[in-house]
């Protein structure tokens, strides 16, 4: 009985330690995924959202971005480099044009080409209903670049990948 008791206790201690490490010290991969989850949460909008919630979410969106973020898109008038403040303003303007809005990210493929840099290829889906009653349902493939700054992963580039159609 005593011979079995100590190995069981040792296994339990190791298991608890591994679980604690997984929850208290997430991998870089999980930290990057968390940034996309936060962006999705804060861009999304429910009908009847309060002004306080709108202001909080818009401010929070800005905190996810680096001081400058590049956007590359087939619509050349949208392409360019934007400051964090400009992104916050665009987010405010965009969210007020919708009664409901949902942003989801799928199929995240994350690579770390160098320390402090993450490349992510993913599918983004934006759905919603505008204040004019029009429905939006857009799906795009994106390539994103995140850079680590002061232990936080910040978005520094988004590129919309053009998909060839028949």
Model-derived features: where do they sit?
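Stable alpha-helical elements in mature extracytoplasmic
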Residues: 28, 35, 57, 83, ...
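Transmembrane signal-anchor/signal-peptide helices with a preference for the extracytoplasmic
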Residues: 18-34
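Sec/Tat-exported extracytoplasmic proteins
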Residues: 40-47, 65-69, 91-98
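Hydrophobic membrane-insertion alpha-helices, especially the h-region
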Residues: 6-22
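Short extracytoplasmic/periplasmic juxtamembrane "stem" segments immediately C-terminal to an N-terminal membrane anchor
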Residues: 34-49, 86
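Surface-exposed, charged secondary-structure patches
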Residues: 26, 86-132
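Short, solvent-exposed secondary-structure junction/capping segments
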Residues: 40, 58-77
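Short beta-strand edge/turn micro-motifs at domain boundaries
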Residues: 117-121, 133-166
């Amino acid at each position: 009985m005593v011979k079995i008791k100590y190995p069981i206790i040792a296994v339990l201690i190791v298991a608890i330690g591994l679980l604690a490490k997984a929850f208290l010290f997430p991998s870089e991969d999980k930290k990057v995924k968390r940034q996309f989850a936060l962006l999705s949460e804060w861009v999304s909008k429910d009908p009847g959202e309060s002004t306080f919630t709108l202001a909080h979410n818009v401010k929070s969106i800005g905190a996810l971005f680096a001081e400058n973020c590049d956007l590359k898109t087939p619509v050349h008038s949208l392409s360019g480099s934007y400051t964090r403040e400009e992104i916050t303003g665009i987010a405010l303007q965009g969210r007020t044009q919708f009664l409901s809005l949902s942003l989801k990210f799928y199929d995240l493929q994350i690579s770390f080409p160098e320390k402090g840099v993450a490349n992510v290829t993913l599918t983004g889906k934006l759905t919603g209903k505008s204040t004019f009653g029009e429905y939006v349902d857009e799906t795009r493939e994106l390539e994103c670049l995140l850079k680590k700054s002061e232990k936080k992963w910040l978005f520094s580039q988004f590129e919309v990948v053009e998909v060839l159609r028949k």
